[in-house]
Amino acid sequence: MCLILFAVNPNSRYRLIVAANRDELYARPTQIAGFWESLPDLLAGRDENMGGTWLGVNKKGAFAAVTNFMETPPDPLPPRSRGDLPIGFLTSDSDPNAYLDRVSARGNAYKGFNLIVSNRDKCSYYGNRAGAPRELEKGYYGLSNQILDCDWPKVFDGRAKLMEIISAFDDPGEALFSLLLEQGDDRKFSSSFIAADTYGTRATSVVLIGTDGNLLFEERNFGVNGIPLASNRFQFNCDVGF
């Protein structure tokens, strides 16, 4: 059960704030976040099974992330990988709305997913189980493996805590990581962080994109039973270039 908590234009300092957990089988081969040799403008982790990603940015300050949509029973496996969807946006200069319109035209070629894409001007959302693409207004949002802003406790409570953190901290990074590590209570879908022996939270990520062009991407990785592993931190100004 992945989690993405994010704020669109929350204040004069930031145009996008993201706190995200990727939950996956520990046995699934994964590369930790970094710039890709084959796509040098792309900064993201990589799923080695299918070659895609779950969350990333590019050097121009665009952002994209995807989650699976939980379905019972699961749909038969279509030919396209959902992890290609963030890459398609981050390796283009597409307008977010235009990109999601193109994706929605072939949405039935994928298993259920939610996709967030953002550039300097706008942030937009599309889920192929959630209706038409839409541009997101200024505000605070939560996404897991259901529709945007569903009533799951970790989404509902997480969004409220995201608002509190952004109001309280000029630099919210560490507070966001603490939020992502919360293990919830007895309610179903309440745990942000999952620590188990075969499946759990593999990566926690914080992305801060400032109105001044400064971009921070930090990823912390975890193994079986939530044991901390590697961490990576990247910071650059997407207005200056490389």
Where are the language model's segments positioned?
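N-terminal nucleophile
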Residues: 1-242
